[in-house]
């Protein structure tokens, strides 16, 4: 079984999602192996623009099974919204989308803890002015 890999070796925004969308009909499996909901792949399907953050770009293609792998970070709130936004297209997610049991989750508590941690840094770190004195 041959495998082709599409990697972005810059800072993102290389158009990987669009390339996958163009090539998806040639593949049985489209896998997203890393990244999180901060990524965004803008695709056009049936004349409508869609921005996918977690769901792989091959989801609109009938042949491809889409896989969310171990290294992907899933925000359940964003993921649920993506699924709901795609409901009008009658995509059978039970057959077309597989999610690794080892994929990571971003929960609301993580966001709260992250915000609290950042807020503490604002008050405990010396300012550049203090360092230069």
Regions found by a protein language model. Name each.
Residues 1-125:
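Non-transmembrane, aqueous-exposed alpha-helical and coiled segments at domain scale
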Residues 123-133:
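Single conserved hydrophobic/aromatic residue that forms the stacking wall/gate
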């Amino acid at each position: 079984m041959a495998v082709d890999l599409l990697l972005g070796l810059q800072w993102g925004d290389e158009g990987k999602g669009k390339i996958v969308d163009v090539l998806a009909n040639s593949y049985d499996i489209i896998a997203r192996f890393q990244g999180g909901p901060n990524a965004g792949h803008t695709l056009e399907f049936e004349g409508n623009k869609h921005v996918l953050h977690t769901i792989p770009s091959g989801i609109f293609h009938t042949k491809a099974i889409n896989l969310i792998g171990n290294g992907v970070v899933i925000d359940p709130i964003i993921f649920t919204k993506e699924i709901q936004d795609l409901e009008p297209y009658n995509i059978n997610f039970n057959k077309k989308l597989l999610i690794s049991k080892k994929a990571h989750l971003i929960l609301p508590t993580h966001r709260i803890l992250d915000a609290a941690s950042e807020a503490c840094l604002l008050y405990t770190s010396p300012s550049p002015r203090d360092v230069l004195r």
